[in-house]
Amino acid sequence: MLKQHLTTYLLALMFIVPFLLPAQNGFVPRVEELAKKVEPEVIQWRRHLHQYPELSNREFKTAEYVAKYLKSLGLEVQTGIAHTGVVAILKTNKPGPVVALRADMDALPVVERVNLPFASKEKDVYQGQNVGVMHACGHDTHVAMLMGAAKVLTQMKSELRGTVVFIFQPAEEGAPPGENGGAKMMVEEGVLSKNKVNAVFGLHINSATEVGTIRYRPGGTMAAADRFVIKVKGKQTHGSTPWTGIDPVIVASQIIQGLQFIVSRQTELTKEAAVISVGRIQGGVRNNIIPEEVEMEGTIRTLETGMQDKLHADIHRTATNIAESMGATAEVEIFKYVPVTYNDPKLTD
């Protein structure tokens, strides 16, 4: 796995170096040489970050760890962007493009169950629940790779032109409910405009990708991610006499089935892929009392804006109609988190 990570990191460097070199002849061996030297450090950084993960908008120690290293390279470092974001700037003092490299820093509320010396033992509170914290999505690797890229490109400074902006983004998984954060907030705070960035390059590791390869394509590449919350309201009653109330648990279960019907029967999957998943459902406080309300929360993934709008309308219609048909009501809220990751065809080619 580490070899896969480091190969991807090396290839990512190769993507941007041609934009920054006055002449491209011989840059591959030079990058390979420097990447090989930094490999032990990348492994060390990744294991440290993996052992001490932090949730979205709570990446305080991670940001401090990253900023301290970037400052040791002599880079201009900015902290506190979008709460915990870190930006470092490498100026070659020669005219050329401004190219950004980006990595995400946050972990997930997941208990790590592997027996490794650098396994996470961290715990935190998420939405009122005590949870384990784990880098289950590879962001520890992304951060370590970008730290390595910063070192390699700093060592190549005299050979480059233009400027490199290293962006370490918090809250890629989405800011906690009621908070702002992530890429949108970084952009709003001027991380691109203030630095006059011409292009941004990023990557995401994938355990399904063959070791030693990298996959990319022009256009829509990674799906938009939206969050939805559905509150089903019925009528509370005793579990022994359900006919005297309106059971929101049963209504919610039918809505969940209906959401899957949207994807499997109302979406033309030969033209566009889509996913609707419910990740949380909560209601009631006692086993023998039918609750008044059930709340569910989930995610919507699409690769095209038109499909995104259609699914939003379908979810509203499905939830409210099913609830009404069973004597209940459903309130639907949909939050657009991140748009489709769109690769500029010119930069991709």
Task: Show which residues each predicted segment covers.
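Metal-dependent amide/peptide-bond hydrolase catalytic core
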Residues: 24, 72, 253-349
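Bacterial N-terminal signal peptides that target proteins for export
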Residues: 1-10
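Soluble non-cytosolic domains of exported or imported proteins
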Residues: 36-40, 53-64, 136, 140, ...
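Acidic/His- and Gly-rich active-site-bordering loop/insert found
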Residues: 24-134, 144-161
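Bacterial N-terminal signal peptides
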Residues: 9-22
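Structural recognition of the beta-strand scaffold that forms the well-ordered cores
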Residues: 46, 78, 98-102, 135, ...
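Histidine/acidic-residue-rich, glycine-tolerant segments that coordinate divalent metal ions
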Residues: 123-134, 140-141, 152-153, 158-280, ...
